[in-house]
C-alpha cells in the first residue's frame, strides 16, 4: 500500500514497453495464450462450443446448413500492481535504474498472473477464468499413462493439446520417467536437462504451476488456442520519493530514509474454455 504524491514521474515509454515485453516472455500463460487489446470496460468474446459440420451432396441437391454453437464470455481487465523501493543511488544512475526495473518488475507481474490463472492464488473477480478445478490426471505412478490420459480427455472435449506448463517438481518427475530398458522417456540425453517437448507439444516452465492440494498439482496441459488474455494499456510505471509505503508490518518513509519507490501496474484479463485443459497431479 502506498500514498504517491503529485511529484510522481512517468518513466519513458520504451522502458514501460520493455517491461511488458519481458513480462510476456516470463509468463508461461502469456506465451501460450492469444493476446487481445481491451477497452477499459472489457469486451464480450465468442466461445465456440462446437464446430459446423460439412456433408457430401449430390449434384442438384440442397446444400446442408450447419452452424457452430457459440457462447459468449465477458473479458474484463483487472489491475495487477507492485511497488518496489530503491535506494536513492539508483536514481542518480538512470541507466542502472532502468536496467533494474526491466530485470525485476516483469518477473513479479508474470509470476502473479500465472499463479492466478493456475488457481494458486484467488482470482480478482468473477469474469476471470482459472484452471484450478479442471480435470486432474495422476503422473506420479505412471507419468506416460497420465499424460496420455490428459491428451485423451482434452480430445474428447474437441480440443487438441498444443502446450504444457510444468513446475520444477513436474520437471523432476518427468526426468525420472523411464521405459522398460531404463532409458529416459522425455529427454534425448542426460546432458540436455530440459524438457522442451512433451508428446510433440511445446513445454513452458513456471513456479506458479505448482499448487498445493489433495492431490498436489504440478503442471497443466491444454488447447491454448481456446485461451485468451487481454491488456488495456500495457505496463504503467511511475516513481516517487515523497511517499510512505507499507510492506507487511513495516512502514517506510521514502523521503526520511533517502529512498524512492517504483510502482508498476497493468490491467489484465483471462478467459478460456476450461473443458480443454487438464491438471497434472501427484499425491503427497
Spans of model-derived segments:
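Assembly/oligomerization interface modules of large self-assembling protein complexes
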Residues: 2-80, 147, 276
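Short, Lys/Arg-rich flexible segments
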Residues: 2-30, 83-94, 110-118, 122-124, ...
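Extended oligomerization regions of viral-like shell subunits
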Residues: 38-39, 135-260, 264-266, 278
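Short loop/turn segments at secondary-structure transitions that flank enzyme active sites
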Residues: 51-53, 81, 90, 111, ...
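Short helix/loop capping segments that flank catalytic or ligand/cofactor-binding pockets
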Residues: 53-57, 94, 173-176, 229, ...
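Alpha-helical scaffold segments that mediate packing/assembly in large oligomeric complexes
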Residues: 71-74, 79-157, 180, 204, ...
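Structural signal for terminal/edge beta-strands and the immediately following C-terminal loop/tail
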Residues: 268-284
